[in-house]
């Protein structure tokens, strides 16, 4: 694909109009249209700004892409996953999980995954299904998977969570404060240290990272992908060690380590 086709493709993926891009760059929408038709090319300053607006690297805009594959944001229907998780929770009397599922669906209503039209609830349901597929049928784990983002992303309070105190504590452990460039290392160091002391929180966090690694190619910029790789390399060995040292999670630890390290290796080679 040409530079113009790349610009158009990334703009449409971000659900931006030519007018919106033009406003961000302080140019006319006709200029953006001419770039996408390959009649003209943006100058260097415009190209850098354009990459920032579209949240991609400059090379992603200018390099000709020979092979275009059809991709999809979601593999399973989230409503089908919800039915599966609720049915399993009923069968195994996971009462906290049953309440957590409905609470999470309502809390995340109207939210989408980054750079997609996929409802956000797809993510926690994916985590719950991942745990169940590894034969981890624990009320605290399934409920924790469903609720792990509601405090951070939905402006909810711990006291409002319809679950027992152990699950509330797991959610608290998995929630980290907002960071800045100045305090990010300090906050993340304390965050992962806290997680590594709790086997259930460690397991959920590893499942969460598996899901985030599989979706970050369409949800994150190249710089954010790079940061995610570095963060995973730095902190996950310690969290994974906690999962491995918990006998009932031994099989899950093998699968999770394989998935995380395989995904990391793929991204590193492609980066």
What do the predicted segments below correspond to?
Residues 25-41, 63-66:
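Recognition helix of helix-turn-helix/homeodomain-like DNA-binding domains
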Residues 26, 45-60:
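DNA major-groove recognition helix of helix-turn-helix/homeodomain DNA-binding modules
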